[in-house]
Amino acid sequence: MGCIKSKENKSPAIKYTPENPTEPVNTSAGHYGVEHATAATTSSTKGASANFNSLSMTPFGGSSGVTPFGGASSSFSVVPSSYPTSLTGGVTIFVALYDYEARTTEDLSFKKGERFQIINNTEGDWWEARSIATGKNGYIPSNYVAPADSIQAEEWYFGKMGRKDAERLLLNPGNQRGIFLVRESETTKGAYSLSIRDWDEVRGDNVKHYKIRKLDNGGYYITTRAQFDTLQKLVKHYTEHADGLCHKLTTVCPTVKPQTQGLAKDAWEIPRESLRLEVKLGQGCFGEVWMGTWNGTTKVAIKTLKPGTMMPEAFLQEAQIMKKLRHDKLVPLYAVVSEEPIYIVTEFMSKGILLDFLKEGDGKYLKLPQLVDMAAQIADGMAYIERMNYIHRDLRAANILVGENLVCKIADFGLARLIEDNEYTARQGAKFPIKWTAPEAALYGRFTIKSDVWSFGILQTELVTKGRVPYPGMVNREVLEQVERGYRMPCPQGCPESLHELMNLCWKKDPDERPTFEYIQSFLEDYFTATEPQYQPGENL
């Protein structure tokens, strides 16, 4: 997949604005009003978009989908993106949120709950710290610690997390009614949301969201008749009594260790000898993908490129851009071997390529709610790329990776414009993914975020057909001719017409009439409440 600086987004001719009424919290003595605010689009990377200049990239990999297999599960940082960098005026003690095994001789191993004095936190994502328990100095991943005795250090605090991601976690198999988490409110600055797993006869398993409001004097409440000095006291109260909630709080929602930002301190350009290729996962036009180990300690995915695929100098420059793109739904780039044969090291994902997962893995048995949720996750990642003014250029199931609990991440970005292969750069050559490409991009090379939207419509057909090749029975040239004449794929068997209507919006001839990824994400996240509330499982979907 390629991410490039895109043209300025124009307002579409059709305005896609879902209604987002936010119901006020009921402060009566009975059951509390549940927060029904529509999930806002959230990004794991905050702040202004980086200006990486105008780039022109082509997608990596061709039709066979040579993609790195990224991480075993989604990670949500429960720590703010940064803490105050000054350590003067008193020492702040930090506490470990997770266990960590050292990957290099410069790292510190530690256990959850261990306390640290931070020596230097001004050099990025890895901080120099001293363990109070052992007295040892070393580097620690900054997103594995939080200030001791802070809200961020509480096990139930999940920080910046959207409503939909909270629901995904709480509804994971094995979780029981009453399991909960606290997160920042998406709709009210300075407020929090309490998300609880519930069950009822009508909806079955579901999640209720309650807004935790802040008093002027610093206290907290869900209803004004029950106010608390601290968030910790509020949580403790509702673990003892439901007191108007749908259920009393039982246990904290399980989470997983977040991915570290990079493999270790200054581990970016790494020696080839530090990597061990162990299991070949796939191959394609331009290289192979392996599961392997870095430094004898860390499981990774390794993409090996055939010599001559791209210039090493250009690749290294591009990789500097790739590693700056950070989002929960993008596979992170960890490190590179920049001399030929080029190696690209990324997060390892346990379930592999989405296309294979749908055709040969457990994905064969998924029903429409799971498939729509996977599409919503992909739209979430693409909405981030949209906000960053980049484009993907090769969005399809072969470039999406799957982890535990059906977590999906977008892979393979930033490389394609560097590929030196006539069968690819010709756009209509054998290695170019014509069936996924918008006509203006295939015919005239006009790649924009709106051509990505077209590709997303095709990807939706891959999901609901469990990996069927688009335009069955048609060869590439025929597809291009028919699409130019106005042909669009019919509604796949078992697919609701409302979902097919979204596909057709993505396939509008005029790129400006196609929806934004922000709209697509919102539509898919609320699909079974706003669009198809009467859905009943069928034979295949």
Swiss-Prot record:
Residues 156-253 form the SH2 domain. ATP binds at residues 281-289, 303. It comes from Rattus norvegicus. Signal peptide: none annotated. The active site is at residue 394. Keywords: ATP-binding, Cell junction, Cell membrane, Cytoplasm, Cytoskeleton, Kinase, Lipoprotein, Membrane, Myristate, Nucleotide-binding, Palmitate, Phosphoprotein, SH2 domain, SH3 domain, Transferase, Tyrosine-protein kinase. One of its GO terms (biological process) is cellular response to transforming growth factor beta stimulus. It catalyses: L-tyrosyl-[protein] + ATP = O-phospho-L-tyrosyl-[protein] + ADP + H(+). A lipid is attached at residue 3 (S-palmitoyl cysteine). One of its GO terms (cellular component) is anchoring junction. Residues 1-29 are annotated as: Disordered. It comes from the Eukaryota. Residues 19-29 have a biased composition (Polar residues). This is Tyrosine-protein kinase Yes. It is found in: Cell membrane; Cytoplasm, Cytoskeleton, Microtubule organizing center, Centrosome; Cytoplasm, Cytosol; Cell junction. It holds the Pfam family SH3_1. Residues 275-528 form the Protein kinase domain. Phosphorylated. Phosphorylation by CSK on the C-terminal tail maintains the enzyme in an inactive state. Autophosphorylation at Tyr-424 maintains enzyme activity by blocking CSK-mediated inhibition. Palmitoylation at Cys-3 promotes membrane localization.
